[in-house]
């Protein structure tokens, strides 16, 4: 189900009850005021209505412990919603940064990332280093409380994070949807779907219990 950019309170409540998980995709830059910064000259225009919807949806789904997967902007949204900050433009703010803003085609590897030992992404991949694509000019700067790193680019840019106290809350900076045919990338979506199914089973079992 793809959500429209505007939902009233009743519609939001219905969506939260209907859906067992949420995927937050890539897109426009997040308004810097949401992480306590003024807009720099390099920050692209934001979409206030999208920010409003997605931050509200995230906080409510987080309270309900719904599974959530964030891709690119989605990782950045999770981080800022939980109290972290962002680099507004890597080339200007991180000397020596890789060129993270690749051109088409996106279904190819442009750099490697190192997966943190003991994290679920490392367990999924079964190896320390994997290749990824890269299509972003912003990135996590200060990681939010409650999130732990899962992957790093060679230049020190955070590439993935998760919340260990949640059933499934992963943020991925690259775009695994273009690399789905590789197990370590397609498996991210499979784990998310499996977590949503687990949540659905719990809901059904709870509703079946008398009283």
Stretch-by-stretch model annotation:
Residues 32-49:
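Glycine/threonine-rich flexible loop motifs
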Residues 27-30:
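Short glycine-rich anion-binding loops that position phosphate/pyrophosphate groups of nucleotides
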Residues 72:
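Conserved G/P- and acidic residue-centered "switch" motifs that form tight phosphate/ATP-binding loops
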Residues 75-77:
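Hydrophobic, aromatic-enriched interface-forming segments
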Residues 12, 32-35, 80-81, 161:
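Short glycine-/acidic-enriched loop or helix-start segments at secondary-structure transitions
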Residues 2-20, 24, 47-64, 91-211:
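Amide-donor transfer/coupling interface in amidating biosynthetic enzymes
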